[in-house]
Amino acid sequence: QTMYYSTLNQKNFNPDDFRAIKFVIQGGSQPLPSIQQAFKKYGINIINGYGLTEAPLVMVNTPENARHKPMSIGKSVMFVDAKVLDEDKNEVGDGEIGELAIRSKNVTPGYWGQPEETKKSFHNQYFLTGDLAKKDEDGDIYIIDRKKELIITGGENVLPSEVENALAEHPLIDRCVVVGYEHPKYGESIAAAIILREKVPDYVEQLDKHMRERLAGYKVPRMYLPVTHMPLNSTQKPDKLVIREMMNSKVNKESSSEANHNA
């Protein structure tokens, strides 16, 4: 995803240089629909693959299937068995969201020297990936989000990817990452780190209106943090831990400033 953003935003980006390319395969994180659509304008399909450090290449979509289901990671490759499980480790129905679990010879037998971590990462020989997913009636699988990144605000579950997808549709947004931050009343609230294409004074009002037209009120970010560069981790993915710390720090500073003002 980081590479696709960078490619599109290069000043010397020329679509003619990519005329011979019909599709590219990506993994690591799922591109936003806006990125898929941007590449499709140039006749390039982004095909999603899926794998983990614990299980290299588990699934990959096909060029033909990607035309109709661009956000799918396709079906399991040969000798890989995949299920989508609920919290009680029961398989969910088509279209329902649960945790993706896989069983195969290429799955790690466990974590070296960490028996407890190994034990909680497996269920009946299936490795629990930590990724929320759903399966359609054709057996194609879609990654929804990381389970641990689910935001619970006032008892409501919010998928960061859903908020990011809606936010990315606004013409002001060049890039966005959504996280939960500590909130005294709701436990967590929603914040977005954003890179703006253009600096305008009323960007918060514009984004808030845009989001409320697309999502339920509890899914709308309560805070926006403009940044010039998105923090990335060692694998060049957005570093949500750092971004979350930035949000909490911003809230604490604002609370401290307000307390001093009222003193």
Residue ranges and their predicted role:
Residues 4-68, 81:
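Gly/Ser/Thr-rich phosphate-binding loop
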Residues 23-26, 178, 225-226:
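Hydrophobic/anchoring residues in structured secondary elements
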Residues 28, 51, 74, 89, ...:
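Active-site glycine-centered loops adjacent to acidic/histidine catalytic or metal-binding residues
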Residues 47-54, 74-75, 179-182, 225:
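Beta-strand->loop->alpha-helix junctions that form or flank phosphate-binding loops
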Residues 71-77, 91, 121-125:
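Short Gly/Pro-enriched turn/cap motifs at secondary-structure boundaries
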Residues 83, 94-108, 126, 132-133:
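AMP-binding/adenylate-forming core of the ANL superfamily
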Residues 88, 104, 109-110, 117-120, ...:
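AMP-binding/adenylate-forming catalytic core of the ANL superfamily
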Residues 245-263:
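Acidic/polar alpha-helix N-cap and adjacent early helical turns
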